Amino acid sequence: MAFTRIHSFLASAGNTSMYKRVWRFWYPLMTHKLGTDEIMFINWAYEEDPPMALPLEASDEPNRAHINLYHRTATQVNLSGKRILEVSCGHGGGASYLTRALHPASYTGLDLNPAGIKLCQKRHQLPGLEFVRGDAENLPFDNESFDVVINIEASHCYPHFPRFLAEVVRVLRPGGHLAYADLRPSNKVGEWEVDFANSRLQQLSQREINAEVLRGIASNSQKSRDLVDRHLPAFLRFAGREFIGVQGTQLSRYLEGGELSYRMYSFAKD
């Protein structure tokens, strides 16, 4: 996702129902338009210096830069043998990779986008992996159901972020963890940090990853641009390039200039 002029306009809607209604339209549109067999990840990319060089299956190689972000975020905690919930799982590529690579006991991917969930259920069929439709601010699970919650590049779309954090706390078992990565306008980082401080989550780590995200976007840029040009009509291509992450777009200038802060966190439930 990108915080672009579109996001700036939507931000004026604040915590209104209009905000969520826009995303309920936008994500299914992108699922239908962006070639569902090609785009299993809708997060931006990530690469370190020197490169991470993860050992990947041949089928995962085209998505290396996207997988890097999932791997680095998720491995802030130990997933092996744990009950995992990913909130806003997109097209399920990250859920599939983490299930295969890190061996959780179970992995549940949740998303508000019905077209995305239908795609996930068709495309990613693995033992212990399931996908359900649901709202990040009203999770359809019992208290203390999960050991780890994963949330990557999604919460900036939630109109009531503190409500999401409260739901994370509710569904985590005592001692459970949140592995999290997202972005905010730099002038909103203080509010972001206050929301974390007011939750029942203890911050274990935090770092800004603008440089790594920009490096990943650069490595993926031509592939992403070609994908948008193939599948979107001309009037949607500007928004599509911002959404998917292409070098030289407004998002990359915001990241380079520091107007956006992309951060990775880990938290534990008190």
Curated annotation (Swiss-Prot):
It comes from the Bacteria. The keyword Acyltransferase does not apply. It holds the Pfam family Methyltransf_11. GO terms for molecular function: S-adenosylmethionine-dependent methyltransferase activity. Keywords: Lipid biosynthesis, Lipid metabolism, Methyltransferase, Transferase. GO terms for biological process: lipid metabolic process; methylation. Its EC number is 2.1.1.-. Catalyzes the methylation of the lipid moiety of the intermediate compounds phthiotriol and glycosylated phenolphthiotriol dimycoserosates to form phthiocerol dimycocerosates (DIM A) and glycosylated phenolphthiocerol dimycocerosates (PGL). Belongs to the methyltransferase superfamily. Phthiotriol/phenolphthiotriol dimycocerosates methyltransferase family. This is Phthiotriol/phenolphthiotriol dimycocerosates methyltransferase. It comes from Mycobacterium leprae (strain TN).
